Amino acid sequence: MPLELTQSRVQKIWVPVDHRPSLPRSCGPKLTNSPTVIVMVGLPARGKTYISKKLTRYLNWIGVPTKVFNVGEYRREAVKQYSSYNFFRPDNEEAMKVRKQCALAALRDVKSYLAKEGGQIAVFDATNTTRERRHMILHFAKENDFKAFFIESVCDDPTVVASNIMEVKISSPDYKDCNSAEAMDDFMKRISCYEASYQPLDPDKCDRDLSLIKVIDVGRRFLVNRVQDHIQSRIVYYLMNIHVQPRTIYLCRHGENEHNLQGRIGGDSGLSSRGKKFASALSKFVEEQNLKDLRVWTSQLKSTIQTAEALRLPYEQWKALNEIDAGVCEELTYEEIRDTYPEEYALREQDKYYYRYPTGESYQDLVQRLEPVIMELERQENVLVICHQAVLRCLLAYFLDKSAEEMPYLKCPLHTVLKLTPVAYGCRVESIYLNVESVCTHRERSEDAKKGPNPLMRRNSVTPLASPEPTKKPRINSFEEHVASTSAALPSCLPPEVPTQLPGQNMKGSRSSADSSRKH
């Protein structure tokens, strides 16, 4: 018998009046969007953590709740001080026990995140260089009805490896009290410890049944095997588009337009007199940057095109960069919306990211529309994007790893250029005001604003929702409790009790924490 449906007031989508019973967990892997464990593979300093963080940022941005579980963080939590590369020697049995238990502790948290906390994808960031370790992870995934997808980063270029070590590794907590030369020497010896037992993925023989992608020489070549579903295909597509070449991305809004002056949203009005001054100032700014082969992108709306015309440079128009569609509220002021559509006004104040204008769009829709723009931005070198407030917020949220709840309230003032420079594990942003006055179109978060739908409702949703959950500190409270709880699933990997410090070590260094609007 057909279910009775009702339309949700916020997202304007049809949902059953009564919640349907959840599917049994045994059906999990058959679902298109069932939980997935991404397993990183590769020697140290091959960019695994870079890929993990960047991929996680992308997946969260498109609305797939994702979290990284870095086993190195668990190791630093279990062993408070690091001595030397001897910790990673294959004949150091005490250290091997610690490392295996840290991996198990991370898998425990992976299970909790995917099964209880509404997560969709967990990135297991470790070397995972042996088939024995990868078999353990596959067994764990099968026992918990998770899919597994392997990403191996392979690089034999000594220049790239040395660059990775200098840029990232020597600044890690492990080498807090070492100079650069000492850190480099120790880390190279650490790599040698892994090389002795490294068993690369072999899709032609041993690993022909695994879903995997091998990223070779920082994206020069790729090898893909047995992609299982839509999400895995998107991961492959994303990894094939990113690069690590130095570049700068400039983001700005169009110059002030007539609707900005009137407080109206949407529409397609031209620049005001101050908006034209900004366009001239932007042209001068671009000349001063002296950028080689700068690409300029605009929307198909009048104000961005007028702004770009002042640059006297070729530019490309993207329909995807058009401002968010306000539907029946287009070209109204917020006061007019409040008076004409009081319920819609209140709903949007409560839930700005998920709220969809009648016959219009939501921020969630806008993110989906902008995904091709992000893909192309990742492929490019120097780019200037001239767009609109809601669009700029979405792009900025991607590069700065902002949550769905933060996105609609990011401050993106008129007549200001945001200069983005990709760095090791993130993006550095510089705000440059071009000294041309304008109206302020930013609206602060309402006190009535609330979080979106329950994250546990995402898994069987057609459009997964972004995760509002913050990154949690690794939890290594009781290895004994963890071993007992995983004994059935991992019978061959049961290590004994974990020491907090290895016998006979005189360790140095300590762990430190790292880390790295108007319209709508």
From Swiss-Prot:
Chain intervals for the UniProt region annotation (Disordered): 443-520
* Tissue-specificity statement: Ubiquitous.
Q: Which residues bind beta-D-fructose 6-phosphate?
A: 75, 99, 127, 133, 169, 190, 194
Annotated region (Fructose-2,6-bisphosphatase) at 246-520
InterPro entries membership: 6Pfruct_kin, 6Phosfructo_kin, His_Pase_superF_clade-1, His_PPase_superfam, P-loop_NTPase, PG/BPGM_mutase_AS
Modification after translation is described as: Phosphorylation by AMPK stimulates activity.
Q: At the top level of its lineage, which domain of life is listed?
A: Eukaryota
In residue numbers, the region (6-phosphofructo-2-kinase) covers 1-245
Catalysed conversion reaction: beta-D-fructose 2,6-bisphosphate + H2O = beta-D-fructose 6-phosphate + phosphate; beta-D-fructose 6-phosphate + ATP = beta-D-fructose 2,6-bisphosphate + ADP + H(+)
Task: Recite the UniProt keywords alphabetically.
Answer: ATP-binding, Hydrolase, Kinase, Multifunctional enzyme, Nucleotide-binding, Phosphoprotein, Transferase
Residues in the active site? 125, 155, 254, 323
As for what it does, the entry says: Catalyzes both the synthesis and degradation of fructose 2,6-bisphosphate.
Describe the subunit structure: Homodimer. Forms a heterodimer with PFKFB2.
Descriptive protein name: 6-phosphofructo-2-kinase/fructose-2,6-bisphosphatase 3
Could you tell me which species this protein originates from? Homo sapiens
